[in-house]
Amino acid sequence: MAITPNGFIAKKDDSSDFLTKKESQSYVATVLKAGALVIGRRTYGVLSKQSEFQKFLKAKIKIAIVSKHSMNIKSPYHKVANSPQSALNFLKGSKEIVVAGGGLLNASFMSENLVDEIYIDIEPNLFSEGIKLFEGGSFDVKLKLLGTRMLSKNEIQLHYKVLK
């Protein structure tokens, strides 16, 4: 998941215009490799307007949208789930599942101890207000660094294992 050095995954208005093309390519490759994605309602709304979304539709990526509200979904491979566990039940059988926000959803997965690994792509931008990587929730998690990878001369990916 892309974040700024000060911990934001999106601007206050849900904009992610600070993300680089390299980051977008990394995100798409990760989701296509995994084959399954969990996102929140607002993230689904933003993602469905981006060109990357067409690649997910074409590849028949299973997407669980965690929301308490009913919504118009774009594919029979997408489903609204009312909880993190319900989302995982829908995606059962997937070899990997990417959880990609927003901050409330990320925090709920961490609070319910449902995360095994975290990939954080640090983007070279700072802004003072926005959506944090984790919004709310109650957790205290230790991590072990598994590796780092340069995405570009200004972007680095950190790969952590969640210690349970």
What are these regions (language model features)?
Residues 1-164:
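Enzymes that bind and transform nitrogen-containing heteroaromatic metabolites
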